């Protein structure tokens, strides 16, 4: 059984440093990334796709953004399971309960709006951990793992948020406790943990079964977001053995270029390096210059 793990589409996102035609082109690229995810899923023989939170940038979006997103999802060749995250929680203003979303939601799109176990195929369950507010007061994942049986069912946890090992902050009560996750893996209650929230592809712990897929299209500069633009294809066989493969889907780059400038040659070299950037129409460069130049 194969599935595609993705997260953090944040459809409707705007970037303050994109001007003119760049912003609509970037927005279109984020929608096109969904189509690319569908192509990967079909080509790799995936049974379904999980989107682990922050599908939308917020719950307050222009109707056009919602309609365009659902239309792209309609064309994805597999079932798509959407998890509400911190940007689009299941609160009173949730996009997922809006009249527009419910009226236009395609048959292949399913919202994981109830915490707990959801059968997707015989012998395979998703353990959904949706956000109902922007600030949970406890570890939502540990709550769902408590008492989960090791009964031979292959289970994928679909969750969103930070993990205590990566962000050990005692002031954040909603952090996911890695020990509870790894204990559930060790006893055979769960077999993979699909995470969203971190926009760079990241393996968590040493089990090989806990991953952030990262965002399918870049959202920040590379000194902040080191490895975006991927989706993960997860192959989980009947024995519980697993294989995780990354596939590139992103097309944009947000690059921080640090350069020392002390003379005319340095300026010329900088210009040459900028000229050599490929795909300039999809590359944003932030310059960080150091050095001393004469005013004459």
Kindly label every feature range from the protein language model.
Residues 1-3, 125-131, 234:
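Core dinuclear metal-dependent hydrolase active-site scaffold
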Residues 53, 159-162, 289-292:
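Short, well-ordered beta-to-alpha junction loops that form the rim of enzyme active sites
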Residues 40-46, 75, 151, 278-280:
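Glycine-rich phosphate/diphosphate-binding loops that line cofactor/substrate pockets in enzymes
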Residues 48, 59-211, 215-220:
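His/Asp/Glu-rich metal-coordinating catalytic cores
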Residues 1-68, 146:
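N-terminal active-site segment of His-dependent metallophosphoesterases
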Residues 200, 204-209, 213-226, 230-266:
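Glycine-rich, Lys/Arg-enriched anion-binding loops that position phosphate/diphosphate groups
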Residues 32, 43, 236-296:
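Accessory, non-catalytic peripheral segments of nucleic-acid enzymes
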């Amino acid at each position: 059984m194969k599935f595609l793990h993705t997260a953090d589409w944040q459809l409707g996102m705007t970037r303050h440093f994109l001007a003119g035609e760049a912003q609509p082109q970037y927005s279109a690229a984020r929608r096109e990334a969904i189509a690319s995810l569908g192509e990967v899923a079909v080509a790799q023989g995936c049974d379904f796709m999980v989107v682990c939170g922050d599908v939308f940038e917020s719950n307050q979006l222009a109707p056009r953004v919602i309609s365009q997103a659902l239309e792209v999802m309609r064309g994805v060749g597999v079932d798509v399971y959407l998890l509400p995250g911190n940007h689009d929680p299941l609160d009173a203003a949730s996009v997922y309960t809006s009249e527009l979303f419910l009226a236009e939601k395609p048959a292949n799109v399913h919202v994981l709006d109830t915490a707990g176990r959801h059968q997707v195929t015989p012998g395979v369950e998703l353990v959904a951990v949706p956000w109902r507010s922007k600030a949970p007061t406890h570890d939502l994942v540990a709550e769902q793992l408590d008492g989960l049986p090791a009964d031979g069912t292959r289970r994928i946890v679909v969750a969103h948020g930070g993990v205590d090992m990566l962000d050990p902050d005692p002031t954040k009560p909603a952090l996911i406790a890695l020990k509870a996750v790894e204990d559930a893996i060790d006893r055979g209650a769960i077999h993979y943990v699909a995470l969203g929230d971190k926009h760079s592809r990241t393996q968590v712990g040493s089990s090989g079964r806990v991953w952030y897929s990262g965002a399918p299209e870049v959202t920040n500069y590379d000194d902040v977001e080191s490895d975006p633009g991927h989706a993960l294809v997860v192959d989980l066989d009947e024995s519980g053995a697993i294989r995780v493969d990354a596939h590139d889907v992103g097309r944009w780059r947000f690059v921080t270029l640090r350069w020392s400038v002390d003379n005319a040659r340095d300026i010329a070299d900088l210009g040459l390096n900028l000229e050599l950037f490929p795909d300039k129409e999809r590359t944003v460069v932030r310059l960080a210059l150091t050095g001393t130049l004469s005013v004459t």
